Amino acid sequence: MGHIELLDAYNNVINEWKERTRMENGDVLELIDRGLVVCENTHRRGLLLNGINPSFNEKKNDKSNIFFVFSNAEDQGRSRYWAKKHKQFGGRDSDLVQNHMGYLDLFPLKESRQLRFEKILRPYNDLRMLLLKKTQEEIERIDPKLIVHANKGSLYY
């Protein structure tokens, strides 16, 4: 499953879940309506960096920006997330980052504040489980030798 198929799989899970539950919780629907984002991991990689979910910028919520490449990811505004991650592994242009490293958020839903993200998803363990199942399938496809958690939120899962 490549990044396009992964995005389709996530969308199918969400659409089936919405259809089945007919839920009307504004917070989780708002999260879903922001659009999904996945990293392009087209090759198997030795090292996989996991985050919990993509950030969200209300001013720049571009729903057409659905894919990114880890080695080219750039920070927006005051965030230094990507700069720190690249530096941890030898810099954006290092052989490790360019050729041997992938990135995958456990959830494709955009939200910058981890506590808010967890609070919104807490009542919807079924949705969380379905999304994580697709993420697990992608991790198995990438077949990393080592998984590094970008933060304690991703370590929890």
Please identify what each model-predicted range represents.
Residues 1-77, 131-138:
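Active-site and ligand/interface coordination hotspots across diverse enzymes
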Residues 43-45, 97-98, 141-144:
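Short, well-ordered loop/turn elements at secondary-structure boundaries
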Residues 46-53, 57-127:
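Mobile, glycine- and charge-enriched loop segments
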Residues 9, 73, 83, 148-150:
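A sequence-composition feature that detects small, non-aromatic residues
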